[in-house]
Amino acid sequence: YPIVIDHSACFNHAFKHMPDLEINDISEFLCKFVVPRLDITKCDERVIVHKQCKIKVLGKSQYIEDLARLCSDHVFNIKSFACDGFAGQKGFFTPELNKVATKDLASEVAEYGATLGVSSSSTCEIGLGESGGIPFVSVAYLLDRCSKAKK
């Protein structure tokens, strides 16, 4: 199996700086290696997907959306910003970055009737949850909630 990194910004750094290693973002790993071994039952959540800016740059953002669509028939992509501004740990020390970047997220959540947000960056999830007014969790938690191992 490849190396799996459960934080997209860290994945981006490792992917760029260690080209000889097979490294997957958590969403890509789950799609390629875990999903085929699962029985998935869709949930009733209305899921809004945060495609972390670093995985978008690498062209790997489709994996998180694919996972969300396996788990729910009601999936929406965030359109009100390209980057949430949390910027790794900077959001802890300069929360204004996140607040300004995500100022329209609560309206977007309300427009879609979203009840849960998913991401692949734990620090982004903190700011997104505060700004959006709904829980944002790792997409791995959503997949776990909607699946069981095939027999």
Locations of regions flagged by a protein language model:
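Iron-sulfur cluster-binding electron-transfer modules in prokaryotic oxidoreductases
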Residues: Y1-K151
